[in-house]
């Protein structure tokens, strides 16, 4: 179950680009260990979502252009799970906020209260 990066046969080995567990290794600006080679999206660690790749692309290109962008803050990018009903989230988990000593409010919403969750 899951997504496998499509990195076979695209020349990464010949260039010497570092790969770990089916993902291209990059820094916070999506530079690989090979100068001039960058990677974003589904082939780097992180959520495999189009809007995540878009944020990574903006950061990467701004860095290439010398614009000194802030690294992508993945906690500010919405995430989703395409189930029925759908599940979405944004921000840190409760555990992450606790570990960082950040004041937070946690909410719960029971599926039984959602008409979409109980309709067949």
PLM-predicted stretches and their roles:
Residues 1-68:
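FAD-site-proximal beta/loop scaffold in flavoenzymes
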Residues 6, 43-120:
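Mid-to-C-terminal Rossmann-like scaffold of FAD/NAD(P)H-dependent oxidoreductases
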């Amino acid at each position: 179950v899951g997504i496998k990066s499509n990195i076979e046969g695209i020349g990464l080995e010949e260039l010497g680009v570092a790969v770990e567990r089916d993902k291209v290794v990059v820094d916070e600006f999506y530079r690989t260990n090979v100068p001039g080679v960058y990677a974003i999206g589904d082939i780097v660690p992180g959520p495999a979502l189009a809007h995540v790749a878009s944020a990574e692309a903006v950061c990467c290109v701004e860095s290439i252009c010398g614009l000194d962008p802030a690294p992508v803050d993945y906690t500010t990018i919405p995430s989703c799970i395409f189930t029925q009903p759908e599940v979405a989230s944004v921000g840190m988990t409760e555990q992450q906020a606790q570990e960082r000593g950040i004041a937070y409010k946690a909410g719960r919403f029971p599926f039984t209260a959602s008409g979409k969750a109980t309709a067949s």
